[in-house]
Amino acid sequence: MSDVFERVKKIVVENLDVEADKVVESASFIDDLGADSLDLVELVMAFEEEFNIEIPDDVQESIRSVGDAVSHIKAHV
């Protein structure tokens, strides 16, 4: 597992109050991890802060899974 994935996983566990073993790259934030639209906004803000990046609004809409987040972050750090 990559460092980016582990950091994303930690943020997801803390923000969504889910068990760490449920946070896998294929997990959908909404369908698998129970996030709502506000949770998604808060996750993106946490990712931006953790990785010191800015995720544009149009990209935020395409981040629907843990893997989507990891891929985007890896491409911009």
Curated annotation (Swiss-Prot):
Biological role stated in the UniProt entry: Carrier of the growing fatty acid chain in fatty acid biosynthesis.
Q: Name one GO biological process term.
A: lipid A biosynthetic process
**PTM description:** 4'-phosphopantetheine is transferred from CoA to a specific serine of apo-ACP by AcpS. This modification is essential for activity because fatty acids are bound in thioester linkage to the sulfhydryl of the prosthetic group.
- Which compartment or compartments is the protein found in? Cytoplasm
Q: What is this protein called?
A: Acyl carrier protein
Keywords of the record? Cytoplasm, Fatty acid biosynthesis, Fatty acid metabolism, Lipid biosynthesis, Lipid metabolism, Phosphopantetheine, Phosphoprotein
InterPro entries listed in its UniProt record: ACP, ACP-like_sf, PP-bd_ACP, Ppantetheine_attach_site
| Listed PANTHER family | ACYL CARRIER PROTEIN (PTHR20863), CARRIER DOMAIN-CONTAINING PROTEIN (PTHR20863:SF76)
Keyword Lipid biosynthesis listed? The answer is yes
Carrying O-(pantetheine 4'-phosphoryl)serine, the residues are 37
User: Mainly localized where?
Assistant: cytoplasm
Q: Which gene encodes it?
A: acpP
This protein's record includes keyword Mitochondrion: no
Q: Which domain of life is it from?
A: Bacteria
What the entry lists under PROSITE patterns is as follows: CARRIER, PHOSPHOPANTETHEINE
The Carrier domain sits at 2-77
Gene3D superfamilies the record matches:
ACP-like
Name the protein family: Belongs to the acyl carrier protein (ACP) family.
One annotated GO molecular function is: acyl carrier activity
One cellular component term from this protein's GO annotations in UniProt = membrane
Pathway-wise, it operates in:
Lipid metabolism; fatty acid biosynthesis
Instruction: Name its species.
Output: Hyphomonas neptunium (strain ATCC 15444)
